[in-house]
């Protein structure tokens, strides 16, 4: 395995240096998970799932978001997880760099791991793992094939459904409101709802678990969600930030994005 060669392929494909490095590390980590017994204890989420679903290099992501399933979220558990991914016969090493950080924001509790990936030639690259716990058992995890430069056919791992991804991004937007800085999430939601398409019943189930029936949310119905999202998405300052080309990975018309999202709840 030659990390530099893999990164160069992604650069030739149009990614900048940082995103090519992140994608190379992503490929290594997902491939190692799929080949290990930890594949049954991990589900992939966040930007990595969005990147795969969209197949669009503009939807870049720097971190790797994972949830543990029936596995302890402790520092020792995390270190054992990383060790398990690298048996002696694998020609790449993973090393945790520095302390494991606690992540706590808006009711979310997780861990951040700074990871160094080193190949047999001594080339090293660094990435971040953001780890959580899959505790919403009614939300079924689905098998998703991830493209990777290390396997021609890709690798299969459990992942959040696109309906869960959509509902979690909407939950965050409603919870934080117009003060949210996660503008890319708005375009993710629009892509899932209006371009990729979602199963209406599956989205309703995900919204019910994550929003309507959640003790820490005020929105109890699609009508409540519509009212809250309408206030947030039509806030003038929020709209200005949405219009920033850096946030708009789709290059979509912002008014069309807002209208498209609200149409699903109105």
Mark where each language-model region is.
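Structured mid-to-C-terminal alpha-helical surface segments
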Residues: 1-42, 52-60, 64-266
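Glycine-rich beta-strand-to-loop/alpha-helix junction loops that act as flexible
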Residues: 44-48
């Amino acid at each position: 395995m030659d990390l530099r060669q893999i990164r160069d392929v992604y650069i030739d494909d149009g990614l900048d240096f940082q995103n090519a490095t992140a994608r190379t590390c992503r490929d290594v980590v997902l491939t190692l998970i799929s080949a290990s017994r930890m594949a049954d204890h991990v589900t992939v989420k966040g930007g990595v799932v969005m990147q795969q679903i969209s197949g669009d290099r503009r939807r870049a992501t720097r971190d790797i978001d994972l949830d543990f399933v029936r596995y302890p979220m402790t520092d020792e558990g995390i270190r054992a997880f990383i060790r398990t991914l690298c048996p002696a016969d694998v020609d790449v090493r993973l090393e945790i760099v520095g302390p494991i950080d606690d992540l706590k924001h808006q009711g979310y509790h997780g861990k951040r791991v700074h990871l160094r990936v080193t190949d047999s030639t001594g080339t090293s690259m660094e990435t971040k793992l953001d780890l959580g716990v899959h505790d919403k058992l009614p939300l079924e995890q689905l098998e998703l094939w991830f493209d990777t430069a290390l396997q021609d056919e890709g690798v299969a791992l459990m992942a959040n459904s696109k309906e869960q991804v959509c509902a979690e991004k909407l939950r965050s937007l409603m919870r934080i409101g117009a003060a949210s800085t996660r503008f890319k999430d708005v375009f993710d939601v629009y892509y899932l709802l209006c371009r990729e398409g979602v199963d209406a019943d599956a989205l309703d189930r995900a919204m019910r678990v994550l929003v309507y029936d959640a003790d820490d949310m005020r929105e109890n119905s699609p009508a409540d969600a519509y009212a809250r999202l309408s206030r947030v998405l039509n806030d003038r300052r929020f709209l200005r930030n949405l219009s920033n080309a850096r946030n708009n990975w789709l290059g979509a018309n912002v008014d069309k994005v807002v209208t498209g999202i609200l149409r699903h709840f109105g």
